[in-house]
């Protein structure tokens, strides 16, 4: 794949998962041996099925919209900074929904291999984000 194709894969990943809520798109875009380094998670997310579970859990709790602010790529790596809007719509880790909405920016780095996302690094201020949504300090 070309660098431009890598960038298009990452843009599609974000659109399908967050904006279209299509977790099944991971069957095509996510490598079976995916590794996710997700800020705030105590352990690595390992494998396509674990990745699907992670996204499904977030999408069950929040209405989310993601807009990329910028994107660049070199070799097999793609970096993107996103502006994220979310609203609490269902239980989150046993806490009832607050109905509040908030914004967040994130920085993601993706490693592409064989036309799929093989590895992802996600950084964001989860604590501030959850406080803005009314969940208090975590």
Per-region residue spans from a language model:
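C-terminal and inter-domain tail/linker signature
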Residues: 1-138
